Amino acid sequence: MWFCGASIAFALMQKGLFSEMVLIDANHAKAEGEAMDLSHGLPYTASMDIYAGDYKEVADCGLIIITAGANQKPGETRLDLIEKNVGILKSIVPQITATAFEGILMIVANPVDVLTYAAQQISGYPVERVFGSGTVLDTARLKYQVGRHVDSRSVHAVIIGEHGDSELPVWSGANVSGIDLNHFCELRGHFNHEASMERLYEEVRDSAYEIIERKGATYYGIAMA
């Protein structure tokens, strides 16, 4: 589960959304260590049973989050990971379908759009049971960038399309507390909208590359998203 999986598990523990969480990793000792470490924080949040297990434990789960996959290396795009990560999915998903699992399958690995489709095809589950994280992280990054000038919780804007280099911001629907973003900027004395929007979009699109170059992987943002 490594960085992304462990960060998501930590975020879920803090939210107290579940009464039980099982961690599965090819390195079982790693999953055990993460479960122990997370469990030691439970006195400060909601009661929850966190433990390391294997696929026989997932039959009664309401939600399975798959984060397994090769990480982007500096200079790689998400699409460069397709062959490796589809291969990993092919080793994981059949172990899930072999159980009586009837819950939701969520994919949080790259390239997430391709892998979500692959997971649905491999599993045979109906499309309404297989989801990907999509552009939720990109949307959070956009709201953060705009929100550096205001409270980001007041910013309403979305990124659509691929979670990757072809993603697109929907500026026409962007607003701050219900005020159209362009109008809001003019009220604050800022009129160079197009140049600023293009710069913000590029910062959002390229932010993963910037983070990977500096620390090797991204995981906190997607865990919160």
Model-identified regions with their sequence ranges:
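Glycine-rich Rossmann-fold phosphate-binding loop(s) that bind the pyrophosphate
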Residues: 1
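N-terminal Rossmann-fold NAD(P) dinucleotide-binding loop
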Residues: 5-6
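Aromatic pocket-lining residues of Rossmann-like dinucleotide-binding sites
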Residues: 12
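Conserved N-terminal Rossmann-fold NAD(P) cofactor-binding segment
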Residues: 20, 24-62, 76
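Redox-cofactor binding/interface segments in oxidoreductases and associated redox assembly factors
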Residues: 64-66, 107-108
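Conserved NAD(P)H cofactor-binding loop of Rossmann-fold oxidoreductase domains
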Residues: 68-70
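Rossmann-like NAD(P)(H) cofactor-binding subdomain of soluble oxidoreductases
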Residues: 78-143
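C-terminal substrate-binding/catalytic lobe of Rossmann-fold NAD(P)-dependent dehydrogenases
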Residues: 123-129, 137-225
